[in-house]
């Protein structure tokens, strides 16, 4: 069946043309004019295909889902068609513990889908459309090849989907306060609020990232920092933007995600902590109810000094030490500071994948 081409809204075409105009500025003045025109037409078609491959995503979490407390029960965002068989890549938190998922065309039509995979380690979510979408999939590019200030396209999907031009502001490791860490995250500007699951494309229409967060400091306040802490020498002006999970993290695990629903790296220890560095020390921001940390007696405000005897000063160091320390389910020693007193707590970690609820039959 020949893929159906949806109508691109006028505003979207304006943004696509702006992207092409920005790319034109990078051309070599010695290139042949005819070759430039052919290249421009090819890129225009590729960008149109990329925009049409972005769909809306609507999900409803299962009853009593732990994630509903922070993400809500009903969620919406975007996803990108990456396979001719209806395979859609999105950001995992949209479909975490979901019992019902639908894909949304630009004209509002709904297509039922199921969750094929959720990868804790990268944050990716994988969906399978249950009926034909009639669209061309977007090819995967190389996120590592994206260079600073290169014009990029951000596209969200669904009835209110939009297209805009962005630039790569920085590429660096990112540690999330919720026991999450990825390498070489892509930070872009200007910011988009409809970032969840949105596609980040290069000028060839190749997918290079999936939208995850709105961030206050896309440039990185201090070069090389991965804990999100600013201040001190070398500080750069803050610039709001978005964080995209690079598709280079998907390529090595895609077959595994399709076969098992998660990568081997997702079977790791989980404590149920939200942490950040405050005043030079790792502090507990929140403890998930009934989590290992909650059972062990940790509370918001506790300072974490050591984990299994290893001194930690940054959030990424804390998470990586936790995951590298042994089996997902084990006894962990946390040295903490509370009310100016140092004490040691024993925490029995659990396998993160075992804590997630699934719809019946999945």
Regions found by a protein language model. Give the residues of each.
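Conserved active-site neighborhood of the chymotrypsin/trypsin-like protease fold
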Residues: 62-64, 76, 83-163, 185, ...
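PDZ-domain C-terminal substructure recognizer with occasional recognition of PDZ-binding tails
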Residues: 114, 256-262, 290, 296-299, ...
């Amino acid at each position: 069946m020949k893929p159906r081409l949806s109508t691109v809204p006028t505003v979207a075409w304006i943004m696509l043309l702006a992207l092409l105009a920005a790319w034109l500025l990078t051309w070599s003045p010695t290139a042949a004019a005819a070759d430039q025109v052919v290249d421009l037409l090819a890129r225009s078609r590729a960008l149109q295909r990329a925009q049409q491959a972005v769909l809306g995503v609507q999900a409803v979490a299962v009853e009593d889902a732990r994630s509903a407390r922070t993400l809500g029960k009903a969620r919406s965002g975007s996803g990108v068609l990456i396979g001719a068989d209806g395979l859609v890549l999105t950001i995992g938190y949209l479909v975490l513990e979901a019992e019902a998922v639908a894909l949304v065309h630009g004209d509002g039509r709904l297509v039922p889908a199921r969750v094929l995979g959720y990868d804790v380690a990268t944050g990716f979510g994988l969906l399978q459309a249950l009926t034909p979408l009639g669209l061309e999939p977007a090819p995967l590019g190389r996120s590592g090849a994206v260079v600073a200030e290169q014009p990029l396209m951000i596209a969200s999907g669904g009835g209110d989907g939009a297209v805009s031009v962005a630039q790569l502001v920085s590429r660096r490791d990112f540690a999330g306060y919720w026991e999450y860490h990825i390498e070489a995250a892509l930070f872009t500007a200007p910011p988009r609020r409809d970032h969840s699951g949105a596609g980040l494309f290069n000028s060839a229409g190749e997918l290079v990232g999936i939208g995850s967060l709105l961030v206050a400091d896309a440039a990185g306040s201090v070069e090389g920092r991965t804990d999100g802490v600013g201040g001190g020498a070398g500080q750069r002006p803050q610039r709001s933007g978005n964080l995209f999970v690079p598709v280079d993290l998907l390529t090595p695990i895609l077959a595994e995600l399709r076969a098992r629903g998660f990568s081997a790296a997702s079977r790791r220890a989980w404590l149920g902590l939200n942490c950040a560095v405050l005043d030079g020390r790792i502090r507990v921001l929140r403890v998930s109810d009934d989590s290992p940390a909650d059972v062990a007696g940790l509370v918001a405000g506790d300072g974490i000094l050591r984990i299994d005897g290893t001194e930690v000063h940054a959030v990424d160091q804390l998470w990586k030490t936790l995951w590298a320390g042994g089996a997902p389910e084990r006894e962990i020693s946390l040295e903490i500071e509370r009310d100016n007193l140092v004490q040691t707590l024993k925490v029995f970690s659990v396998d993160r994948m075992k804590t997630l609820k699934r719809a019946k039959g999945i």
